[in-house]
A protein has these predicted regions:
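Substrate-recognition "cap/lid" segment bordering the active-site pocket of phosphatases
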Residues: 86-88, 114-140
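Short linear capping/connector segments at secondary-structure termini
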Residues: 40, 92-94, 133-137
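N-terminal helical cap/lid subdomain that shapes the substrate entry/recognition surface
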Residues: 2-91, 103, 116-119
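Core-facing hydrophobic residues within beta-strands of well-ordered domains
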Residues: 4, 97, 129-132
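A broad, structure-centric signal for solvent-exposed, well-ordered loop/edge residues
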Residues: 54, 96-97
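Residues at the starts of beta-strands that form the adenosine-phosphate
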Residues: 106
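Nucleotide and nucleotide-moiety/phosphate-recognizing core
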Residues: 93, 100, 127
């Protein structure tokens, strides 16, 4: 009998390396607004609290809320087209998930990434893995 019955994983930065697609999308927004861009390492420190927070932390200090919201709208349009371009599983993750399935340990994903993105990325990269639940950010 297994000591563990189930494991819940985060998506970004845990199962998938998504930093390049996210960073490229935010930098494209910043270029449109004539703001300085950031490198991938900078974005690693800005991620974790959702896209609005990411934009708030990426625009220069003192940027007004209206500009941030316009930037967020543009980011979503850009990221819709880019979110699968450079994203990939971390080395060994697919094998780990496969072994957990073989052991009968239930696997779930809980992410603050939008639910549609979360499900599409799981289907793309882990189509042979059985997940009990996949949850991304949802309205309400």
């Amino acid at each position: 009998m297994n000591k563990y019955k189930g494991i819940i994983f985060d998506l970004d930065g845990t199962l998938l390396n998504t930093i390049e697609d996210i960073s490229d999308s935010v930098n494209e927004v910043l270029r449109v607004f004539n703001c300085p861009e950031h490198n991938y390492d900078d974005y690693k420190l800005k991620l974790g609290s959702g896209f609005k927070s990411l934009l708030e932390n990426s625009f220069p200090e003192g940027t007004d809320e209206e500009t941030i919201l316009k930037g967020l709208d543009l980011f979503v349009k850009i990221y819709d087209k880019k979110f699968k371009n450079k994203t990939k599983p971390y080395e060994g993750i697919s094998e780990l998930l496969y072994e957990l399935n073989k052991l009968g340990i239930k696997i779930g994903v809980n992410s603050n990434k939008r639910n549609d993105y979360t499900n599409e990325l799981i289907k793309k990269f882990f189509e042979d893995i059985s997940f009990v639940d996949i949850f991304g950010e949802r309205e309400g």
